[in-house]
Amino acid sequence: NIKKRNDKINELNNYLSLMCSGNFDLDIMDNSEGEMSILKNNLYKIMTLLKTQNEQLNTDKLYLANSLADISHQLKTPLTSMMVMSDLLKDEKDEGKRNEFLSIIETQLDKMKWLITNLLKISKLDAGATEFKHEKFNIAPILEKSLKQFYVTCDVREIEIVNEINDFEFVGDENWTGEAIENIIKNCIEHTNNNGKLRFFSQKTNVYNSLFIQDNGCGITKEDLPHIFERFYHGKNSSSESVGIGLALAKTVLEKEKGDIIVNSELGKGSIFELRFYKTIV
């Protein structure tokens, strides 16, 4: 009995050594009875947990590497443009040309600022470093506030804004909901031609209230549709101004509020984004 017990202890010790070296593919389940079997099965549970955590860690490392590559690429493009414009400015005497180059540099700086700001926001959401308020708000004032910053752009491009919403209450965070709405509006404007139309309307059900944001732009292909909320994703019809972070941020915000964003689109006819606010947590 003592020999058998020592053999089992040595066996468990070997399993522990293999686990410490990173081997989590051991078949150590034991269906027999006894204290050693209980210990062995508990060891198996720990091994399974460590294996899952290790796989998640590798996934996170890969995601981080890909994200850093994407961020680097997104920053490299405007930086390259600014460097070119800066070199041209050194030798350019024409005041009109100089102002044109400075305008391009300013545009690229705004693009970089927007990217960095939104990356910081989405990082805070990922890290759980942001506390979401759960208060009652009306959607109409939030939409109006979000729309204000796009009035000039829509006016210049002659994009018609049609606001047909019936106001409703929802429980959430006013500022973060505004962020989500702004990013969807920005996306719709980027993919809508001059003389286009943006339409806002709402729908109420017993379970949720919805805000719809509709454009009559280029639409989204069936292949791209399942991926548009992925970070840094660029579809076939992506705008040159798009960095692929706005819709991901909007989706994250709605999910944090226990809501959802649903999109329907038809190529060449436009897209409809539905922001769904549940009346009770589901």
Task: Locate predicted features.
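Conserved micro-motifs of the catalytic ATP-binding
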Residues: 127-132, 165, 169-172
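Short helix-loop "hinge" at the ATP-lid/N-box region of the Bergerat-fold HATPase_c
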Residues: 187-189
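Short alpha-helical segment of the dimerization/phosphotransfer core of two-component systems
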Residues: 107-112
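Short conserved segment of the HATPase_c
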Residues: 220-233
